[in-house]
């Protein structure tokens, strides 16, 4: 499998894909995540940060992931690096099927991701229901309005999306991405699709300095170059057909990719630089 994560002595992938076209990723699920202290009888105990790695190594489809979570593995509250990360997951496959996996105090839940979007807390059902608060959103501009007996002619575009939340909270990002995913013009091929998805993800990315942490906690040796802000370190797009993992970073908007099909015969793990230094293309001498 190919993915992004911190290796240390064991591989814990934040997200990735495998040779069968199964894709998975995890996101922060603060306050709501809860894991059992021990495994169910007859199941494998699994620390939450290793779920993506385990599923990509053993499953070929979303259906197999769901079945494994129900029958083969238990997510248990065993600390990793001194803590149990509060996380939840999303898995998709080549059929277009997608699920959200959330472990709460009342048990493990697997939801079919019909909206096609996932952010952070609260849980997926809450975010989906919250869309009912935005029935007015549409891509079509509103026409003339009557006020005080006068007709006011529109003088700008975008009025159909008036009320679309623009802050960086997870509920607002969910609504924003759900609207964009529903109405954005789909790409005609993989290159166009990848470019479109990065444009959509950019609308939900955290600019450095816009979201200051209220309680960053104790700084540990693992916090290299830590800053007191929440920001989008990287954005990624995965393609199940080409088995490509595309990404760009906060400081470098040049899109890079790794193609898993060209690495399948390898016999050792590989790491690739994120490419965080800015790159600019000088075309001064190319004018005609």
Which role does the model predict for each range below?
Residues 3-8:
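Short, small-residue-biased leader/transition segments that mark boundaries at the very start
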Residues 1-2, 27:
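N-terminal domain-start signal
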Residues 79, 85, 94, 116-288:
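C-terminus-biased signal that marks the final domain/tail of proteins
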Residues 9-117, 122:
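Structured, non-membrane catalytic/scaffold regions adjacent to prosthetic-group chemistry
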């Amino acid at each position: 499998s190919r993915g992004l994560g911190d290796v240390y002595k064991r591989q814990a992938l934040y997200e990735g894909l495998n040779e069968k076209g199964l894709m998975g990723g995890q996101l922060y699920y603060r306050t709501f995540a809860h894991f059992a202290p021990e495994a169910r009888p007859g199941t494998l105990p699994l620390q939450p940060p290793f779920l993506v790695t385990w599923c990509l190594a053993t499953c070929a489809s979303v259906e197999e992931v769901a079945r494994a979570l129900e029958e083969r593995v238990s997510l248990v509250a065993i600390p990793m690096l001194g803590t149990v990360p509060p996380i939840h997951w999303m898995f998709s496959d080549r059929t277009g099927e997608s699920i959200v996996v959330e472990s709460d105090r009342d048990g493990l839940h697997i939801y079919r991701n019909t909206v096609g979007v996932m952010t952070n807390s609260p849980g997926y059902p809450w975010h989906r229901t919250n869309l009912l608060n935005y029935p007015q959103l549409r891509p079509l501009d509103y026409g003339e309005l009557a006020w005080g007996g006068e007709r006011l002619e529109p003088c700008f575009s975008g009025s159909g999306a008036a009320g679309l939340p623009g802050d960086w909270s997870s509920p607002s990002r969910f609504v924003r991405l759900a609207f964009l995913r529903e109405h954005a013009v789909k790409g005609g091929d993989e290159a166009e699709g990848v470019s479109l998805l990065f444009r959509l993800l950019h609308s939900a990315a955290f600019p450095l300095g816009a979201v200051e942490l209220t309680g960053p906690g104790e700084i540990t040796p693992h916090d290299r170059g830590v800053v007191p802000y929440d920001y989008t370190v990287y954005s990624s797009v995965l393609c199940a057909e080409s088995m490509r993992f595309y990404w760009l970073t906060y400081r470098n908007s040049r899109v890079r990719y790794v193609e898993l099909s060209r690495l399948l015969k390898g016999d050792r793990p590989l790491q690739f630089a994120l490419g965080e230094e800015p790159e600019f293309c000088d075309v001064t001498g190319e004018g005609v």
